[in-house]
Protein backbone atom coordinates (compact mmCIF):
# COMPACT_ATOMS: atom_id res chain seq x y z
CA UNK A 1 0.00 0.00 0.00
CA UNK A 2 2.77 2.42 0.96
CA UNK A 3 4.57 1.65 -2.32
CA UNK A 4 1.47 2.48 -4.34
CA UNK A 5 1.05 5.83 -2.58
CA UNK A 6 4.72 6.69 -3.16
CA UNK A 7 4.40 5.71 -6.81
CA UNK A 8 1.32 7.91 -7.24
CA UNK A 9 3.11 10.86 -5.62
CA UNK A 10 6.16 10.33 -7.82
CA UNK A 11 4.09 10.17 -11.03
CA UNK A 12 2.13 13.27 -9.98
CA UNK A 13 5.36 15.15 -9.25
CA UNK A 14 6.83 14.17 -12.63
CA UNK A 15 3.67 15.31 -14.43
CA UNK A 16 3.77 18.69 -12.67
CA UNK A 17 7.43 19.23 -13.53
CA UNK A 18 6.68 18.16 -17.10
CA UNK A 19 3.94 20.81 -17.26
CA UNK A 20 6.42 23.53 -16.23
CA UNK A 21 8.92 22.19 -18.78
CA UNK A 22 6.30 22.48 -21.55
CA UNK A 23 5.39 26.01 -20.42
CA UNK A 24 9.08 26.94 -20.46
CA UNK A 25 9.40 25.75 -24.07
CA UNK A 26 6.39 27.88 -25.05
CA UNK A 27 7.83 30.87 -23.17
CA UNK A 28 11.14 30.42 -24.98
CA UNK A 29 9.40 30.50 -28.39
CA UNK A 30 7.36 33.58 -27.44
CA UNK A 31 10.45 35.33 -26.04
CA UNK A 32 12.27 34.92 -29.35
CA UNK A 33 9.18 35.96 -31.32
CA UNK A 34 8.57 39.10 -29.25
CA UNK A 35 12.17 40.27 -29.73
CA UNK A 36 12.29 39.41 -33.45
CA UNK A 37 8.85 40.73 -34.41
CA UNK A 38 8.63 43.69 -32.00
CA UNK A 39 4.91 43.03 -31.86
CA UNK A 40 2.89 43.88 -28.75
CA UNK A 41 0.82 40.69 -29.02
CA UNK A 42 3.92 38.55 -28.38
CA UNK A 43 4.84 40.62 -25.32
CA UNK A 44 1.32 40.28 -23.94
CA UNK A 45 1.24 36.53 -24.60
CA UNK A 46 4.67 36.09 -23.03
CA UNK A 47 3.67 38.06 -19.91
CA UNK A 48 0.36 36.19 -19.57
CA UNK A 49 1.97 32.78 -19.95
CA UNK A 50 4.80 33.72 -17.59
CA UNK A 51 2.27 34.68 -14.91
CA UNK A 52 0.42 31.38 -15.39
CA UNK A 53 3.71 29.53 -15.08
CA UNK A 54 4.91 31.46 -11.99
CA UNK A 55 1.58 30.96 -10.22
CA UNK A 56 2.14 27.20 -10.41
CA UNK A 57 3.81 26.14 -7.15
CA UNK A 58 6.16 23.79 -9.03
CA UNK A 59 7.80 26.76 -10.74
CA UNK A 60 9.29 27.93 -7.44
CA UNK A 61 12.06 25.34 -7.60
CA UNK A 62 12.18 24.87 -11.37
CA UNK A 63 15.55 25.97 -12.87
CA UNK A 64 14.28 27.39 -16.23
CA UNK A 65 17.56 26.45 -17.95
CA UNK A 66 16.26 27.13 -21.48
CA UNK A 67 15.09 30.66 -20.66
CA UNK A 68 18.26 31.49 -18.73
CA UNK A 69 20.45 30.37 -21.63
CA UNK A 70 22.03 33.26 -23.57
CA UNK A 71 21.04 35.75 -20.86
CA UNK A 72 17.38 35.94 -21.90
CA UNK A 73 16.10 35.56 -18.40
CA UNK A 74 17.62 36.15 -14.97
CA UNK A 75 16.46 34.38 -11.80
CA UNK A 76 17.74 35.10 -8.31
CA UNK A 77 16.65 33.50 -5.06
CA UNK A 78 16.91 34.72 -1.48
CA UNK A 79 19.25 32.80 0.85
CA UNK A 80 16.24 31.56 2.86
CA UNK A 81 14.61 30.30 -0.37
CA UNK A 82 11.36 32.15 0.34
CA UNK A 83 11.66 34.73 -2.43
CA UNK A 84 12.61 34.60 -6.13
CA UNK A 85 12.95 37.45 -8.61
CA UNK A 86 12.61 36.90 -12.36
CA UNK A 87 13.92 39.66 -14.65
CA UNK A 88 13.98 39.80 -18.44
CA UNK A 89 14.51 42.34 -21.17
CA UNK A 90 11.14 43.40 -22.51
CA UNK A 91 11.94 45.40 -25.63
CA UNK A 92 15.14 44.21 -27.25
CA UNK A 93 17.32 46.76 -28.98
CA UNK A 94 20.02 49.05 -27.65
CA UNK A 95 18.15 50.55 -24.69
CA UNK A 96 17.52 47.94 -22.04
CA UNK A 97 14.06 47.89 -20.46
CA UNK A 98 13.50 45.11 -17.95
CA UNK A 99 10.38 43.64 -16.43
CA UNK A 100 10.58 41.78 -13.16
CA UNK A 101 8.29 39.56 -11.18
CA UNK A 102 8.69 38.61 -7.56
CA UNK A 103 7.53 35.18 -6.44
CA UNK A 104 7.37 34.30 -2.75
CA UNK A 105 5.89 31.86 -0.32
CA UNK A 106 3.29 33.08 2.18
CA UNK A 107 1.51 30.60 4.44
CA UNK A 108 2.24 27.72 2.06
CA UNK A 109 0.94 29.59 -1.00
CA UNK A 110 2.89 30.99 -3.94
CA UNK A 111 2.32 34.72 -4.51
CA UNK A 112 3.43 36.50 -7.72
CA UNK A 113 3.67 40.28 -8.09
CA UNK A 114 5.05 42.39 -10.91
CA UNK A 115 7.72 44.77 -9.69
CA UNK A 116 8.08 48.34 -10.88
CA UNK A 117 10.43 51.22 -10.25
CA UNK A 118 10.90 51.53 -6.49
CA UNK A 119 8.91 48.30 -6.11
CA UNK A 120 5.21 49.16 -5.66
CA UNK A 121 4.65 52.91 -6.23
CA UNK A 122 5.02 52.53 -10.00
CA UNK A 123 3.77 48.97 -10.30
CA UNK A 124 3.92 47.65 -13.83
CA UNK A 125 6.70 49.93 -15.08
CA UNK A 126 10.19 48.91 -16.00
CA UNK A 127 12.75 47.81 -13.46
CA UNK A 128 16.39 47.13 -12.95
CA UNK A 129 17.97 43.86 -13.95
CA UNK A 130 18.20 42.35 -10.49
CA UNK A 131 21.27 40.28 -9.67
CA UNK A 132 21.40 39.88 -5.87
CA UNK A 133 19.09 39.53 -2.86
CA UNK A 134 20.39 40.41 0.58
CA UNK A 135 18.42 39.53 3.71
CA UNK A 136 17.86 41.67 6.77
CA UNK A 137 15.72 40.91 9.82
CA UNK A 138 12.36 41.85 8.26
CA UNK A 139 13.44 42.93 4.80
CA UNK A 140 14.99 41.84 1.55
CA UNK A 141 17.21 44.19 -0.44
CA UNK A 142 17.23 43.71 -4.20
CA UNK A 143 20.28 44.96 -6.06
CA UNK A 144 20.09 45.60 -9.77
CA UNK A 145 21.44 47.59 -12.70
CA UNK A 146 19.34 50.42 -14.06
CA UNK A 147 20.39 50.78 -17.70
CA UNK A 148 18.41 53.57 -19.34
CA UNK A 149 20.76 56.49 -18.79
CA UNK A 150 23.73 54.66 -17.33
CA UNK A 151 24.65 51.47 -15.56
CA UNK A 152 23.61 52.76 -12.16
CA UNK A 153 23.34 50.26 -9.35
CA UNK A 154 19.95 50.46 -7.71
CA UNK A 155 18.83 48.98 -4.41
CA UNK A 156 15.14 48.36 -3.68
CA UNK A 157 13.99 47.22 -0.26
CA UNK A 158 11.04 44.91 0.33
CA UNK A 159 9.65 44.91 3.86
CA UNK A 160 8.05 41.77 5.23
CA UNK A 161 4.89 42.21 7.31
CA UNK A 162 2.79 39.40 8.75
CA UNK A 163 0.06 39.65 6.13
CA UNK A 164 1.87 41.02 3.11
CA UNK A 165 5.18 41.58 1.41
At which residue positions do the language-model features occur?
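Short N-terminal edge-element motif at the start of the domain
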Residues: 85, 94-134
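Short aromatic loop motif centered on NTY/YTY
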Residues: 122-136, 144-147, 154, 165
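Beta-propeller blade signature
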Residues: 99-106, 154-163
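N-terminal accessory alpha/beta regions
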Residues: 26-81, 90
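Sec-dependent N-terminal signal peptides
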Residues: 3-13
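Bacterial signal peptide processing site
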Residues: 15-17
Amino acid sequence: MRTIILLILLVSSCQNEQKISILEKELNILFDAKNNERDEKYKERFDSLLQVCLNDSNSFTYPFHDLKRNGKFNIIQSPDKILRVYSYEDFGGTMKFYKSYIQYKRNGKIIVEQLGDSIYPFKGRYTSLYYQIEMGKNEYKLYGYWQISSNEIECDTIIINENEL
